[in-house]
Amino acid sequence: NIAAFLALSGIWFLSDSALAQEYTSFPALTGMISFYAFMLMSVPMVHFVKNTLKFEKYKVLDVINLLFYANALIQGILNKCLKIHMVHMLFVTHVLLFIAVITIVVLMIEEYRRTKDSELKIIMNAFGIMAVAGVLSLCMYWKLEIPFYGTIFEVGVLIFEQLLLTSIFVNLVEQAKTRSELEVYERLLKEDRM
């Protein structure tokens, strides 16, 4: 899930730049790839939350993923059949992203209050940072029409990814520590039997 998110966000970062779209042999295709990567990069993020944090009980996450898939499919159909430009439908994707991140953050806050899990806190902070970067970039895009709005969101995504990777690293270290402790206890138990 992390690898898919990293791949899709990386594709979006590269294909969303004006430089990539202007100097490629296929600018329309590059733009289309950018839109689809942006529309779908949240799907692996939601799967990560469900699988890593054991949030399978929250069916709203399945609904969110279905909405992301439906959004990409419907926008593709509208673009192909009715020639509606993707940029004119971008607001729908922004609203879905906003709803998804807020929903996930609220679920995490509730779960953290219940469990006080340190890994959850790191991931919750990552989503919080991405939510702030997302809202800030949306305001810059829709209200202020500031051209570097994408950079703000990209920085937010990079911080988000860094915190997720930190969470994975912390989890691996804790698992290694637990495994080492178990091996020591097993050795002690073996020595006691002798």
Regions found by a protein language model. Name each.
Residues 1-6, 11:
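Juxtamembrane interface at the cytosolic side of transmembrane helices
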Residues 9-182:
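Interfacial "cap-and-anchor" motif at the non-cytosolic start of specific transmembrane alpha-helices
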Residues 178-194:
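Amphipathic HAMP/coiled-coil signal-transducing linker helices
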